[in-house]
Amino acid sequence: MANLNIFGQEVGADVEGWTTRAFPEKVVLKGNTCRLEPLDRERHGSELFSAYSEAGQKLWTYLPAGPFTNLEEYLEFIKELNETKDTVPFAIINKETERAVGTLCLIRIDEANGSLEVGYVVFSPELQKTIIATEAQFLLMKYVFDDLQYRRYEWKCDSLNGPSRRAAMRLGFKYEGTFRQVVVYKGRTRDTQWFSIIDKEWLRIRKTFEEWLDKTNFENGKQKRGIAAIRESLSN
């Protein structure tokens, strides 16, 4: 049924009791295979630079920053991230090795409207396509929706970045559209694809991750059921 105002115009649904959401804090988020720590250049910089170096310059093709030719350049980048007003960066720690293997950041933080974006998703070769990679994403989502009670969680990428598009869809983000020629970076034009998860979708997505990450879903390190299959079963 349409929601009409006093002029008979159709308007959006009322948001009862809405209040401005809290700005994300520099917290530690703990999982079974990993934890997220506030990104610190002294604690994590050298480990991350070493881990990223294994992938070479191609790791930075679709990111506005990098590649970095030496550790000092990368440490300066971490410093800039931590000084950016609407950015909260995290390092992903492999609990088995206690080493930093990647980063995730909360960016474009809009407390008034309860919206933010996950960005600077930089996974080392060691982290890519692992259980840790998925659990790290889940830990950050849980913090955003369960602890901070945000309404909207965004993912954006270069339209030509196939791995990023596929990752977003696998994790449960919905494609919203493409902004054409929205950015010039590294001397190139960029069309940006937008994806999101909103609060009313979160319960099913959370249950999907919980079932996928359960130890009974793995045998000799191999998944028995994929995330897409679990999510589909929960929608029936």
From Swiss-Prot:
Name of the protein this chain belongs to: Uncharacterized protein YIR042C
A GO molecular-function annotation: protein-N-terminal-alanine acetyltransferase activity
Pfam families registered for this protein in UniProt: Acetyltransf_3 (PF13302)
Taxonomic superkingdom: Eukaryota
Domain N-acetyltransferase: 47-191
